[in-house]
Design a protein with these regions (language model features):
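Acidic, PIN/NYN-like endoribonuclease modules and their adjacent C-terminal/linker elements
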Residues: 1-4, 98-126
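Short, well-structured N-terminal submotif of metal-dependent ribonuclease cores
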Residues: 1-39, 49-62
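Short glycine/serine/threonine/alanine-rich loop segments
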Residues: 86, 90, 106
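Structured helix-beta-strand junction loops
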Residues: 33-34, 67-68, 104
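Alpha-helix capping/helix-boundary segments
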Residues: 12-13, 43, 77, 96-97, ...
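Acidic catalytic patch
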Residues: 66-87
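Generic structural signal for small/hydrophobic residues in well-ordered secondary structure
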Residues: 9-10, 47, 81, 101
Length: 126
């Protein structure tokens, strides 16, 4: 087995953890192999940073994250995220997640069609 081929957006992880149909359907549509998934460091921070997270939810999230490759931010991701944010107006976490998928050559799995639409030109230049 090789490394990851999908980067999961935070909304997909939340959906999968909660058993939401749109996230599950998306994962099934792409035949997602949970052994080949990654998340951005920012997704990990978003998931574990919820203020009302109880111990059981945190444990559930940590177990899921334990199955994922967590991609740490580096200078290349930072630079592209800045360019994406400045040119598209995306929220910084979305720009970071998008930049991570592009720099690491991973397919981004998201329920946010706007995120994909607004970053298409960056994906085409890699």
């Amino acid at each position: 087995m090789s490394g990851p081929n999908w980067l999961l957006d935070t909304n997909v992880v939340i959906g999968l953890l909660k058993g939401n149909k749109p996230a599950i359907d998306l994962a099934e549509d792409v035949q997602l192999d949970l052994r080949r998934i990654a998340v951005s460091q920012i997704t990990r921070m978003e998931l574990l940073g919820f203020q009302s997270l109880d111990a059981s939810e945190e444990d559930h999230i940590r177990r899921f994250l334990g199955c994922c490759h967590v991609i740490l931010l580096d200078e290349q991701i930072e630079e592209l995220a800045i360019r994406i944010r400045r040119s598209t107006g995306l929220k910084l976490p979305d720009a970071i997640i998008s930049a991570t998928s592009i720099i690491k050559s991973l397919s981004l799995l998201t329920l946010d069609a706007e995120l994909l639409d607004r970053t298409t030109r960056y994906q085409a230049t890699r």
